[in-house]
């Protein structure tokens, strides 16, 4: 076996391992939140970024072995941004044999007309895009709308709201749309962004830039993203622990009177969640429980174009 063949075999092994982890993460999220049910028609929102490509790929993979039947239809919204490569997604989806629909709406022109030069356009653009996607879901008969937000997005949103909004609110893996007509799911809710990035690099997805409209990144969100990235580097495993905390909320030990009846605590009340014993010093492991460094972490960084289709 030549050296190149050995490298290729090693890359393929690592890619298979990475895809299995993403598949497991998505499968667990789907099961935990009952995201997909028998007969569902899932509208997969495809932006042309790494997250939505990965979401579509993993859902297609799960579709082949899932114990239930569900269908997928990929939808892209062409907002008529200057320089948008209109041919990329149709060519990619036709090659895959995936049902798809390209929705053409000049939201870019509307935003430019309504928002003064220099002001952020993201809020209005998001509202317009959301309305169009909801309408499209109805037209296609979709029972669920799948978005490509991942675990890091969810954590960033939690800290963004805590730091700047004074709210403990994140981004739920499943919700009812604001018009009350659609169920929105986030199958990548348990997936790490760095895993998605490595997978996208290895699969060589035809990525479409996300800043064609000329908008600047959300500075507050960038601050939070940089902070979490630094924590992940300095304290490995803490990101996993913080995400687990979002799934283990104890209302009686917070301060929201809407979530817990603090006024109702009187002499004779039952002890709730161990009372003040919850604050006694506990043995806390140096490494977060359940977390282990991955032996192939550096190898995964080397995955690029030189791979074959995962079966």
From Swiss-Prot:
Its EC number is 2.8.1.-. It is found in: Cytoplasm. GO terms for molecular function: 4 iron, 4 sulfur cluster binding; ATP binding; magnesium ion binding; sulfurtransferase activity; tRNA binding. GO terms for cellular component: cytoplasm. A motif (PP-loop motif) lies at residues 47-52. Binds 1 [4Fe-4S] cluster per subunit. The cluster is chelated by three Cys residues, the fourth Fe has a free coordination site that may bind a sulfur atom transferred from the persulfide of IscS. Pfam families: ATP_bind_3. GO terms for biological process: tRNA thio-modification. Keywords: 4Fe-4S, ATP-binding, Cytoplasm, Iron, Iron-sulfur, Magnesium, Metal-binding, Nucleotide-binding, RNA-binding, Transferase, tRNA processing, tRNA-binding. Its cofactor is Mg(2+); [4Fe-4S] cluster. It catalyses: cytidine(32) in tRNA + S-sulfanyl-L-cysteinyl-[cysteine desulfurase] + AH2 + ATP = 2-thiocytidine(32) in tRNA + L-cysteinyl-[cysteine desulfurase] + A + AMP + diphosphate + H(+). Pathway: tRNA modification. Transmembrane segments: none annotated. [4Fe-4S] cluster binds at residues 122, 125, 213. The thiolation reaction likely consists of two steps: a first activation step by ATP to form an adenylated intermediate of the target base of tRNA, and a second nucleophilic substitution step of the sulfur (S) atom supplied by the hydrosulfide attached to the Fe-S cluster. Catalyzes the ATP-dependent 2-thiolation of cytidine in position 32 of tRNA, to form 2-thiocytidine (s(2)C32). The sulfur atoms are provided by the cysteine/cysteine desulfurase (IscS) system. Homodimer. Belongs to the TtcA family. This is tRNA-cytidine(32) 2-sulfurtransferase. The gene is ttcA.
